[in-house]
């Protein structure tokens, strides 16, 4: 059975998706979770893009030890220098260089001839190789390139020292049959291809990124580039969880396996959703709320009789928590720790203390606390630690015939501040009070509220997108059984992220 490497680009290509930006602590937390998940390569960012990107790649390179850490770079010495400087302290560094090879890109974007492109590939792959043994070369827009020319580009890259050849379907144009045929052609026509990995990077513009990637595995690809939850530019990238579980569930067909710990899939998906504020669609394969739900009476009867009648996977295989043990206000820290361990969470004493404090607050409001409630507390634990502003209390007055008024009390470092404001509703009044208190000029770009657990006393997760005076956007999330409180907490969380980014 052949081994397929999983190249995760959530922190680079995925983060380019609108609304999916992350700050440095969030990127590091996500990288550590990807390491637990068992991905082979983490593409940490595009080091030359900005000082913050460089800092993020550098920090991730120092934070993980089991994964290869890659930085993207164009085929220029400046990009390659920046990439190497960012990943050089990684235990397993990789430089990922790319250059477009399709006629339309060469003519209109690069303004280079095919001969110049071939020479640039040879020169820059060789230059990258002078720093690092592990070099990946991507031919941007490969799926729309002339195949014979593409094979020559890859042959030049191998001769110059590339160890991985990536074949991107950059605009999501190809079909599974076409991608498989292209991989077969390259395996037969690239000089030295037997000594390198063949990778694929498929976009989802026509909804075929996962199907295209899997077709390439059948054709001989040995690495798949993907993102958690399929996030990415435009319609997104190939979804990691779908790729991995397709290979896992259909080993009989693909004769392939990965190094992924599938029990960490759901946790990785939820963490990313919590960080970015982008909800997981209920019908999302593998990790959606309805992925293992059965409402039809015929289906329910079949599952009760034998789960395999309608289920090809077990929810526990992807780490979806089981609500078999409930905790309450009399449960102690030891019981909480044991529950967390059974769910796959190993927290430090400091992290456990933070979660336990909020667990006791929740237990006073909610009779039975399930695994889903606890998971929500764990995933949101960072929000209480980010930034200098903390919500102390809120009082709102709203109703027909009375002004919508909110009194907010915040603590900022050692100062306690209080402000009252009137608005068009209780949330508008609350947000205005916070803005006035802190002297901020920010705009609420979007707001959403979702129940993250079940029941009439469900925990609500509020997500706000804030925009500052310079057009920069920040995502804030908040958690509470009180939807007003969760919304205010989300707003404060977003402000803290903004203050941290502009400090």
Model-derived segments and spans:
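Catalytic alpha/beta core domains of metabolic enzymes, predominantly
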Residues: 174, 180-305
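Mixed-charge, glycine-accented linear interaction segment located at domain edges/termini
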Residues: 473-475, 479-503
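Short, ordered loop/turn segments at secondary-structure junctions
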Residues: 11, 46-47, 72-75, 99-101, ...
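A conserved regulatory-domain signal marking ACT and ACT-like small-molecule sensing domains
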Residues: 394-404, 413-415, 421-475, 481
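Short small-residue beta-strand/loop micro-motif enriched in glycine and branched aliphatics
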Residues: 15-18, 105-107, 166, 224-226, ...
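Alpha/beta enzyme core
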Residues: 4-6, 16-41, 54-63, 77-198, ...
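A mid-to-C-terminal "edge-of-domain" accessory segment
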Residues: 3-4, 10, 245, 251-420, ...
